[in-house]
Amino acid sequence: MILLKIIHIIFVMIFLSIFFPKSLYASTSLIRKDHIIQKNLENFDDQSAYALGVSLGNYINHSFREQKRLGVILDKNSLLSGIRDSLSGKTILSDQEISMELIKLEKKLKYFEDIVLKKEAHNNKIQGDLYIKKMLKKKDARHTSSGLVFFIKKKGSGKFLHDSDVITVHYKGSLINGNEFDNSYKRGQPLSFSLDSVIPGWIEGLKYIKKGGLIKLVIPPKLAYGETGVPGIPGNSTLIFEIELIDIQSK
């Protein structure tokens, strides 16, 4: 949660104030005066403090960009003032007021996050359906009643798969916009697992090839990660996998 990230940053900055008090107050002084003072980083402590400060600043900027994406814009100067006042022990809000404001902010972020995610998921579903229709027009396209679209690049040989089989595969997965979210080839190592432990689109699609086979799957969200998605894969995403079936081991 974005709010928790900000709270984490505040705690880290308090930690820095204990070990690098001069560096921290020098930074807040620059903020108050709104001008730049060049400083030579002559020793390890100065360089470490500066590096941590830049890292924390980048972290805060990232959090603020994510909030802006949700339509929530917080004032950076007010955030920094709150940190400075906390370090000095002179805050303009009581502990109870601070707790109430944080709860309100968390609810606000959650509300707008839900709206944005639902909107993105709705758009992903529309774009995914259009992409599948486009793929179905290709002459070598095949599809199933469940909505899976596949292209057999190489059939392979031997026996077909069963749900309980342990398979070894190389694969790469991407979204319909071309963004790649996984690639075993780049890791330089194939993956082994039981077929019944993966998404339905894989279970259904891989049964059309044998050992040594190669297949391309276009998987609608209901056969992948559904409306909610997973980290790196937004809700209602249609997925594209190119899978090489290297080995099959029956249990």
Curated annotation (Swiss-Prot):
NCBIfam families: PRK10902.1. The keyword Isomerase applies. Belongs to the FKBP-type PPIase family. Gene3D superfamilies: 3.10.50.40, Peptidyl-prolyl cis-trans isomerase, FKBP-type, N-terminal domain (1.10.287.460). GO terms for molecular function: peptidyl-prolyl cis-trans isomerase activity. It comes from Buchnera aphidicola subsp. Baizongia pistaciae (strain Bp). GO terms for biological process: protein folding. Pfam families: FKBP_C (PF00254), FKBP_N (PF01346). This is FKBP-type peptidyl-prolyl cis-trans isomerase FkpA. PPIases accelerate the folding of proteins. It catalyzes the cis-trans isomerization of proline imidic peptide bonds in oligopeptides. Keywords: Isomerase, Rotamase. InterPro entries: PPIase_dom_sf, PPIase_FKBP_dom, PPIase_FKBP_N, PPIase_FKBP_N_sf. It catalyses: [protein]-peptidylproline (omega=180) = [protein]-peptidylproline (omega=0). PANTHER family: 39 KDA FK506-BINDING NUCLEAR PROTEIN (PTHR43811:SF19), FKBP-TYPE PEPTIDYL-PROLYL CIS-TRANS ISOMERASE FKPA (PTHR43811). Signal peptide: none annotated. Residues 164-251 form the PPIase FKBP-type domain. The keyword Isomerase applies. Its EC number is 5.2.1.8.
